[in-house]
């Protein structure tokens, strides 16, 4: 009886050990080789933002499955947000779980594998509430913008960053200050 009990216990223990699946945490570690941001100040006072990110995923990292972008405020509609990975449309566009206010792009089957490089594009069409009164001169408005960035625990290397502001049609070169 003792021998049979020991045999059953050993069999159950081996089954538990052999069928246990280790749970591995996601490790995001990547370089943003290039970030190009075009900010269009529209004549109706809204903003259109276009990003191009060239991302290299570290060989030791998990697949690069999501990318989050911070936005100036909450005055945007997710139906006006479009994304691409390597010029292929991204189906998952949602509210970011990590950046507030912000959006996330789920790369799904198009995730960037460890050691690979990919190009992520996003268009955020129509962010409202981005102009502010200029208290010194009521004929002017003020605006501010900061490009999206990633925490140092996730990113390494240098980034070639270009931010271009496109002013509304009709604004003359000597008018901005």
Where are these regions (language model features)?
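Bacterial N-terminal signal peptides that target proteins for export
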Residues: 1-10
